[in-house]
Each structure stands twice: as C-alpha cells, then as structure tokens.
From Swiss-Prot:
Location of the region described as Mitochondrial targeting sequence in the Swiss-Prot/TrEMBL record: 65-87
GO CC annotation: host cell cytosol; host cell mitochondrial inner membrane; host cell nucleus; membrane
Swiss-Prot/TrEMBL site (Low pathogenicity) positions: N66
Organism, as annotated: Influenza A virus (strain A/Duck/England/1/1956 H11N6)
Originating gene: PB1
Known role: Plays an important role in promoting lung pathology in both primary viral infection and secondary bacterial infection. Promotes alteration of mitochondrial morphology, dissipation of mitochondrial membrane potential, and cell death. Alternatively, inhibits the production of interferon in the infected cell at the level of host mitochondrial antiviral signaling MAVS. Its level of expression differs greatly depending on which cell type is infected, in a manner that is independent of the levels of expression of other viral proteins. Monocytic cells are more affected than epithelial cells.
Pfam families, sorted: PB1-F2
Annotated protein name in UniProt: Protein PB1-F2
Family to which the UniProt record says this protein belongs: Belongs to the influenza viruses PB1-F2 family.
Further comment found in the protein's record: Is not encoded in all strains, and seems to be dispensable for replication.
Keywords on record: Apoptosis, Host cytoplasm, Host membrane, Host mitochondrion, Host mitochondrion inner membrane, Host nucleus, Host-virus interaction, Inhibition of host innate immune response by virus, Inhibition of host MAVS by virus, Inhibition of host RLR pathway by virus, Membrane, Modulation of host cell apoptosis by virus, Viral immunoevasion
Source species, domain of life: Viruses
Coiled coil recorded as keyword: no
Transmembrane segments: none
Length: 90
C-alpha cells in the first residue's frame, strides 16, 4: 500500500490527520483545507513575496527621460551618500 507524503501545504500549516491502519501502524493523511485556511495561506505567502519585492526593487526615476551616464552617476552617488547618512534603519 502506498503511503501519502506531506505536501508543502500540510508541512507549513500542520493540517495533519493521524489514522491507524489495521496492523496498528499510524499513517498521516492530510486534511482537505477549507477556503478560509487557503485564503490565509495565500495572504501570508503573498505578503512575504511583497515584502521581498519592496526590499529588492529600486524606485523608478520618472524625471529622467534621456539620462546620460554622468547624470546617472551623479544621481546614484547623491542617493548613496544620503542612504549612508540615514544608515540601515531607514
């Protein structure tokens, strides 16, 4: 008889139903999540993705239509100096 493996859903949320077989062994059978549990799981996952996206992205510079390499370098250096003054707690 094939034993069911935990899915990422059951590992992350712990919705496990323990059942006993006829020979006394315990099997772990994932419960079917309801819509509230699925929505909660989805929202937690998406908020983690959104936090990562915010920390990994740069703000666009819409004021620069045709930037030259020198103007970009100046702008980046100004932002870098400002960032260093504020420190990592900004």
């Amino acid at each position: 008889m094939e034993q069911e493996q935990d899915t990422p859903w059951t590992q992350s949320t712990g919705h496990i139903n323990i059942q006993k077989k006829g020979n006394g062994q315990q099997t772990r059978k994932p419960e079917r999540p309801n819509s509230t549990q699925l929505m909660d799981h989805y929202l937690r996952t998406m908020s983690q993705v959104d936090m990562h996206r915010q920390t990994a992205s740069w703000k666009p510079w819409p004021s620069l239509k045709n930037p030259t390499q020198e103007s970009l370098k100046t702008r980046v250096l100004k932002r870098w100096k400002l960032f260093n003054k504020q420190g990592w707690t900004s």
